[in-house]
Amino acid sequence: MLYLLKPLMMALMLVISNSVLAQLKAFPEAEGFGAMASGGRGGDVHIVTNLNASGVGSLQWAVSQPGARIVVFEVSGLIAGDLHIPHGDLTIAGQTAPGAGITLLGHMYTTYNADTGNIVIRHMRIRPGDPDNDWPANQHDAIQFSTANHIMLDHIDASHGADETIDLWGGAAHITIQYSHLSFPIYDTSNGWDHNKGVINHRPCLDSGNCQPGDRTGGYISILNNVFTHSRNRTPALSVGPAEVINNITYNGREGFVHHNISAGDFNIVGNQYIAGPSISLSPFWFDPENSSTPIPTAYWLQNNLVEDPGEYMGTVQNPWNDTDFSNAYTFACCGIQANQFNQSVAFDFGVHSGYVAPVIHSESNLEARLLPTIGAWPHDIIARTSIQELENRNGSWRNFRPADLMIGLTPTTPPIDTDRDGMPNDWELQQGLNPNDGNDHNTVMPSGYSAIEDYINGLASSLSEDLIFYDGFESQ
């Protein structure tokens, strides 16, 4: 009987393993509507071996490989070129780049009007050049995932968009942006570049009022624990719910959370910090749905949003309609928005939506101390460090900030030895009871439930973020 039971037991274990993997978050700390993206889980590992813009061993080569794939790095530094992601089921583990991290000096984008989905990207810096004929200013986003879905962006540093920093315009849905740093969108009026904005999501069919069942939905967006600096507005601009904006910091912007497209859905806006800066006067919220008729199908839950605007408003606002000091200081709604849309007694329960992982909500009073040491891609480069310093000092301005040397304070190091080229160092494999000469054991299911390669890259990301509390990637100053 044993020879009959053994294959049955193995088949059962495989089914259980696949079931467990299907229920796992992108990584243990993943939250929000994009938390269940699996990326390249279960697929091949591709190693980036050079900093070329294309060709074998490049990042572009790695993400272009067929099937599910996890991309790791044995180099670190600057990649001069755009990155096109042709299809989903992809994990990019920027945290594996040894020493200096990875900066993409170009745009990261998926094909417009394609349903590219299931992508996990961590610890990458995206810093495109100035607009040109290929990327004119009205299309010049650092990250353009306009029609993508099921995306997790974690510890991303993005800057130098001339349209938005991150574009989710065309109905993109089921997306989390968390612990990321969006700074220095391009502002240069001498060239007509004055659209320095943050993140946008919309469902274009709402504009015609003729949405069909097969249209992209938009919404299902989580903006969690991020820092925005020097963006005029759209920090973020979300017109479609369900969506949530929780525990973010916005500095030196005009408008924080905004609608300015035809809107529909429910929104939780909780525990954010809006800090006035020197470039423009602050308006923490702007609800402008541009709907042609009422009632407008939107509703809002606002709680514990901290405003630092000396001379105008200093303190925590709940429902802005019920706060006389706030409503005296700011105009925040127009075009049919009514006070009764803000009358929720509790936050919207997004747990009814499949794949949603409720975020931990932290106090709005200590966001700077908690976020500034750990946000963005590790280690912080000179752009990130400057942005953080200007926020801390409450100075700086909108501009096209381009340091001559983006490698200041960043030191590439030698990658660990990986004999079997499965993305996991020999020493780590031995510690985990794996075989450093077996190139196929990266998909071994570990006690955590994750595959071995995921355990490795997840642990590395956690340790890098913790290290940032004590070291910001720069030499002592």
What are these regions (language model features)?
Residues 402-477:
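Extracellular calcium-associated, cysteine-rich motifs in secreted modular proteins
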